[in-house]
Curated annotation (Swiss-Prot):
It is found in: Cytoplasm. InterPro entries: AAA+_ATPase (IPR003593), AAA_lid_4 (IPR041445), DNA_helicase_Holl-junc_RuvB (IPR004605), P-loop_NTPase (IPR027417), RuvB-like_N (IPR008824), RuvB_C (IPR008823), WH-like_DNA-bd_sf (IPR036388), WH_DNA-bd_sf (IPR036390). It catalyses: ATP + H2O = ADP + phosphate + H(+). ATP binds at residues 23-24, 65, 68-70, 131-133, 174, 184, 221. DNA binds at residues 294, 313, 318. This is Holliday junction branch migration complex subunit RuvB. The RuvA-RuvB-RuvC complex processes Holliday junction (HJ) DNA during genetic recombination and DNA repair, while the RuvA-RuvB complex plays an important role in the rescue of blocked DNA replication forks via replication fork reversal (RFR). RuvA specifically binds to HJ cruciform DNA, conferring on it an open structure. The RuvB hexamer acts as an ATP-dependent pump, pulling dsDNA into and through the RuvAB complex. RuvB forms 2 homohexamers on either side of HJ DNA bound by 1 or 2 RuvA tetramers; 4 subunits per hexamer contact DNA at a time. It comes from Edwardsiella ictaluri (strain 93-146). Mg(2+) binds at residue 69. Keywords: ATP-binding, Cytoplasm, DNA damage, DNA recombination, DNA repair, DNA-binding, Hydrolase, Nucleotide-binding. GO terms for cellular component: cytoplasm; Holliday junction resolvase complex. Its EC number is 3.6.4.-.
Amino acid sequence: MIEADRLIAADAQSEEEFLDRAIRPKTLADYVGQPQVRGQMEIFIKAAKLRGDALDHLLIFGPPGLGKTTLANIVANEMGVNLRTTSGPVLEKAGDLAAMLTNLEPHDVLFIDEIHRLSPVVEEVLYPAMEDYQLDIMIGEGPAARSIKIDLPPFTLVGATTRAGSLTSPLRDRFGIVQRLEFYQVADLQHIVGRSAHCLGLALTDEGALEVARRSRGTPRIANRLLRRVRDFAEVCADGRIDGEVAAQALNMLDVDAAGFDYMDRKLLLAVIDKFMGGPVGLDNLAAAIGEERETIEDVLEPYLIQQGFIQRTPRGRIATVHAYQHFGIDRAE
């Protein structure tokens, strides 16, 4: 099993980019949640515009699905400049990056998603571009090779990553602004679901929005995906109107429970509780018990369960916490 196969996967699915673009907020005024990030960016953007400068280079990091691309779009819109978008794996050669940099207009925003996946060769080209707005390019080969410098217009690099720790220190140190996105509160997700429903022309009550928000694992991308699936259910089974009861019925049918867990989450938790008496259990034994690869457990299933306090990793193995027992209504044997 891979993460993209799950309805509650935080990573973007191929068909979602166009749909998400239609409901994506365009300004900081429409940006819900992340109050500290929003407040800081409002000040930084206003200050840059007052000075007539490009915004300082911005690094955005955090779990997938929290709105890093959305924030990059908002920065460009608020600055009134163009947004050029690419990703680390796409920039294979130094020339790929040079082509993008030389086509920028003054103060434009260059957005590099998955910036931690830049190759060392491309990263070396980026250093003088970020620091001095200059591009160092080698022309020719062998003894005839020579370096030329090309002046670039002032621009803003916005880098996004889910793995800030994988960035090299020289690259990380060149970002003047660093923002971490946190998982969203249910109230903020309810607001986001309501706004998305309005953009999509859906009849959604506050209770319906709350039900979707509670099961969205703190992630707007998941909330919007669940909303679209609930819409399908409502159009067929409830005359298109989504209240709390309809949303709950739809999400139960989709096997997403009140905590946002799907079948695989529950299977893992129940294996620890029932088959290994709550743990500790080694990763290989747990993988064999649920019929999954150990990498799937470590990379796909465990992170959210650990973050929510349902599973603990210890030197002796995995342990189910009291929250896991309470979720299933099971008494914990002392």
